[in-house]
A protein has these predicted regions:
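Catalytic-loop of the protein kinase fold
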Residues: 149-161
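Short beta-strand micro-motifs within the conserved protein kinase catalytic domain, predominantly
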Residues: 90-106
Length: 161
């Protein structure tokens, strides 16, 4: 049976090999300009980040220190698994930042939703939407949830809208 250090090394090896084999894209953290915090959750926080010298904007999903590398690797695998659905944010890769204590802080590089969260969008635009628009949004949300459930994935952090 593997001890915790060996398990951590397995996950480090999986990340290194996934990047080397081009299963995952790696983005150097120094190539991002963080412009603002756009959300918080049980996992950590989400930052809006511009890729320097481009017009590309991403969302960087960071993780609280309580998350083990195995949890981050699992989330990456889940994102890769559901990257087939048009109403689920695209997963672009991974980045990390090294601290002075050589602790590596990982972030997922995700598609940036320029309208913000669905909750924010509905709060700001609900009265402007006709019933067809509202029906379409509900259908898209239900379709995305159905997709992940068909893959035996439970979201665990859906918010009340």
């Amino acid at each position: 049976m593997l001890n915790e250090k060996e398990k951590s090394n397995d996950h480090n090896d999986w990340l290194k090999n996934s990047i080397k084999d081009e299963y995952l894209s790696y983005y150097d953290y120094s190539n991002f300009e963080i412009t603002k915090t756009i959300g918080f959750g049980n996992f950590g926080k989400v930052l809006r980040a511009n890729l320097k010298d481009t017009d590309t904007i991403f969302a960087l999903k960071s993780f609280n220190i309580k998350f083990a590398l195995k949890d981050i690797v699992n989330e990456i695998k889940l994102h890769r698994h559901v990257d087939i659905h048009q109403n689920i944010l695209r997963f672009h890769g991974i980045t990390w930042m090294e601290s002075e204590t050589f602790h590596r802080s990982y972030s997922l590089v995700l598609q940036y939703a320029d309208s913000g969260t669905l909750e924010t969008y509905l709060t700001e635009h609900f009265n402007e939407l006709d019933w067809n628009d509202k029906h379409q949004l509900a259908f898209q949300l239900a379709s995305a949830v159905e997709c992940i459930h068909n893959l035996d994935i439970i979201h665990c952090d859906l918010q009340r809208i």
